[in-house]
Each structure stands twice: as structure tokens, then as C-alpha cells.
């Protein structure tokens, strides 16, 4: 595992240097290059949006990428169950309702302890995960997931465990969209639309990653800032004293009003609307916004959050914030939103070139 991590870091560093070199070259290139920067706090859905752009505009995933994602899917499936089981033993103090499933728990936990969670799921491991996922105690722990760090994709992978463990399994686009590995450094997707070369960059969302890269992108055309509106009752992975929504707003404030991006268009994706729609019925947004006095319904709550973000813009006369409610794993919905964003950017480029 240590060697694997070292290789990943080495490859990431090489990729980052290459991208930085290309960014400098782009500054000397013509105006046909349009650079978009994806920003947001960790786990907001940036990488999923980038993967959607790859599906929609860049010929999807290569066979090599699909093979890489297979190991990530296996990892995400095992890790999801192990995270729930550890939370049951720890912060939740919840037992398995069926005590006879302790043996199955040991089988799954051993996979992670041995560092084998990225390997194909054996029939024994798959059946153990499916059996545990059906346990009422595990279901209760899942419902209490805001009290510990559980990725949003956990339910998807646990629901699909049987299919994922079949011999010859090949991840489909939806599996890849839900797959999750923390972004380090910068990841890039390129595509061409109407004679414009788009280059989209996803910068790591954890605090340490953001600090490393922000200065490299002072000449981007637009920033797509992504906030996970469903995370108003959750805390950061890297700082469990900070509310995720508040962190996201603080980051948006610093980017929107940064001297690096005074003339850069701001596009706000209010992501994970599907999870927000379900959660708002159970948990009021007063968790993050004590001054909220509206109803516990989607329309009022989203409108309030939009207003909160709009108020962070210190130059509303000069800078417009384009807001979209999104579900990054819904390809059809994301296609409509991204098409709208790209059309807006193309119009601005034509205006800049004096062609409108």
C-alpha cells in the first residue's frame, strides 16, 4: 500500500509539473483557448462534474481508465461497509441487530486490514457485505451518517455490491461517476466546441491542495465553483470542528473577491440537490444558518442559500454570479447545465472578439 501511494504521488507530481508548464505556454497562445477552473471544498462533486465533461465532450473513458476505476469501485464498496462498521463500534455505540453476523463483519474488516480493498471482491466478501447491508443495525447506522464521515456514494455501491462482484465486472459510466478518490494536485480534461479549445481543471478540494495551486490560474475564463448544498449538517473530513457549508461559503468568498479573479466569471453549481431534497425533510438548515426562518422545504431553503452566496459578492455591479442547481451524477441534467454554461462562455468570447 505504501509503494502504491508513493507511485501515485510521483505520477501526480509529474502530471502537475506538465500542467503548470502547459499553463505558461497557454499564456503565449492565441485566444481560442478557453480555460475553466473547477473549485470547491473537498467532496463537493468537482471530480464528478469533470468526469461528466469527459463523458459528454471528450469521448468518455479509455480502457486503461476503466481498469483503474475498477479497483477504485472495489475500494469504495469495501470502505463504505468498513466505515459504517467502525462508526457502529465507535461514535454510534450501535450493535449489529443479528449477532450471528459478527463472523461476516470480521471477513469484511479483514479485507481492509490486509490492504486488499482495491482487489476483486470474492464471493465470500460480497455475500458478507450484502448480508451486513441488510442488517437493521447497519441500516440505522447509515441513517445516522451525518455523525461520522461516510461518502455520499456509499449507498450506491452497497446496493450494487452483487453486480460489482460478478466475474468479468467492468465499471459502467454510472459506477465511474460515483467512484471517489481524493483529488491531489490538478486533473485536466480537454475538448473542442465551435473552434474553441476548452481546458477544464479540477484542483484538489482539501485545504492543503487549494493553497498550492490557486495562483496558477489568474487568467482563467470562468470559475465553476461547486458547493454541496446537502452538507449543511456535516463537518469537514480534515477538520471535524468546521461545518462543510460554512467552509464552502468562506472559500467562495475568498475566490469570488480575490484579486486574482476580479474579471473572471463566477458560475455556482449548487450540487447534490437530490440529497438535499431528501435531507431537508428530516434536518432543518438552521444547523448551518440559525437565522433561517423559512419552511423545511426545498424551494424556500435553496432560495435562502442562494441569497447567502449572492451576498458574498462584494462587486455585484461588475461581477455576475450564474447559479445552477445540480445533481452531478445525473448525466442528462448535467448536460443541460454544462451546455448552458458553455453557450454563455462562447457568447462572451464572441463579444470580446468583436464578432457580436
From Swiss-Prot:
One of its GO terms (biological process) is olfactory behavior. SUPFAM superfamilies: P-loop containing nucleoside triphosphate hydrolases (SSF52540), Transducin (alpha subunit), insertion domain (SSF47895). Mg(2+) binds at residues 47, 183. Residues 326-331 are annotated as: G5 motif. Residues 267-274 are annotated as: G4 motif. Residues 32-356 form the G-alpha domain. A lipid is attached at residue 4 (S-palmitoyl cysteine). Keywords: Cell projection, Chemotaxis, Cilium, GTP-binding, Lipoprotein, Magnesium, Metal-binding, Myristate, Nucleotide-binding, Olfaction, Palmitate, Sensory transduction, Transducer. It is found in: Cell projection, Cilium; Cell projection, Dendrite. Disruption phenotype: Defective in chemotactic responses to attractants and repellents and in osmotic and mechanosensory avoidance. Residues 35-48 are annotated as: G1 motif. Residues 175-183 are annotated as: G2 motif. The keyword Protein transport does not apply. InterPro entries: Gprotein_alpha_I, Gprotein_alpha_su, GproteinA_insert, P-loop_NTPase. It comes from the Eukaryota. Disulfide bonds: none annotated. The keyword Amino-acid biosynthesis does not apply. GTP binds at residues 40-47, 177-183, 202-206, 271-274, 328. Belongs to the G-alpha family. G proteins are composed of 3 units; alpha, beta and gamma. The alpha chain contains the guanine nucleotide binding site. This is Guanine nucleotide-binding protein alpha-17 subunit.
Amino acid at each position: 500500500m505504501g509503494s502504491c501511494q508513493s507511485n501515485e504521488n510521483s505520477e501526480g507530481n509529474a502530471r502537475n509539473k506538465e500542467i503548470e508548464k502547459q499553463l505558461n505556454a497557454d499564456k503565449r497562445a492565441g485566444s481560442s483557448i478557453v480555460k475553466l477552473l473547477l473549485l470547491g471544498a473537498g467532496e463537493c462533486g468537482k471530480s464528478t462534474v469533470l468526469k461528466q465533461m469527459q463523458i459528454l465532450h471528450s469521448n468518455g473513458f479509455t480502457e486503461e481508465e476503466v481498469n483503474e476505476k475498477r479497483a477504485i469501485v472495489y475500494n469504495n464498496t469495501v470502505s463504505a461497509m468498513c466505515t459504517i462498521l467502525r462508526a457502529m463500534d465507535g461514535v454510534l455505540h450501535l450493535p449489529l441487530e443479528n449477532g450471528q453476523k459478527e463472523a461476516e463483519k470480521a471477513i469484511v474488516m479483514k479485507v481492509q486490514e490486509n490492504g486488499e480493498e482495491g482487489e476483486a471482491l470474492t464471493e465470500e466478501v460480497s455475500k458478507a457485505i450484502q448480508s451486513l447491508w441488510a442488517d437493521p443495525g447497519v441500516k440505522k447506522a447509515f441513517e445516522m451518517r451525518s455523525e461520522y464521515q461516510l461518502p455520499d456514494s456509499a449507498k450506491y455501491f452497497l446496493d450494487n455490491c452483487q453486480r460489482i462482484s460478478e466475474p468479468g465486472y467492468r465499471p459502467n459510466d454510472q459506477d465511474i461517476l460515483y467512484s471517489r478518490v481524493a483529488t491531489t494536485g490538478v486533473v485536466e480534461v480537454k475538448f473542442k466546441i465551435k473552434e474553441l479549445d476548452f481546458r477544464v481543471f479540477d484542483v484538489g478540494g482539501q485545504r492543503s491542495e487549494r493553497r498550492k495551486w490557486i495562483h496558477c490560474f489568474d487568467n482563467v475564463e470562468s470559475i465553476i465553483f461547486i458547493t454541496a448544498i446537502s452538507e449543511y449538517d456535516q463537518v469537514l473530513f480534515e477538520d471535524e470542528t468546521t461545518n462543510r457549508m460554512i467552509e464552502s461559503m468562506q472559500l467562495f468568498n475568498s475566490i469570488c473577491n480575490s484579486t486574482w479573479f476580479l474579471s473572471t466569471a463566477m458560475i455556482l453549481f449548487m450540487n447534490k440537490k437530490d440529497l438535499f431534497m431528501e435531507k431537508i425533510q428530516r434536518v432543518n438548515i438552521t444547523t448551518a444558518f440559525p437565522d433561517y426562518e423559512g419552511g423545511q422545504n426545498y424551494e424556500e431553503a435553496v432560495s435562502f442559500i442562494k441569497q447567502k452566496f449572492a451576498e458574498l459578492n462584494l462587486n455585484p455591479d461588475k461581477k455576475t454570479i450564474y447559479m445552477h442547481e445540480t445533481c452531478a451524477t445525473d448525466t442528462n441534467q448535467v448536460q443541460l447545465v454544462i451546455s448552458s454554461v458553455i453557450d454563455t462562455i462562447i457568447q462572451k468570447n464572441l463579444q470580446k472578439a468583436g464578432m457580436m
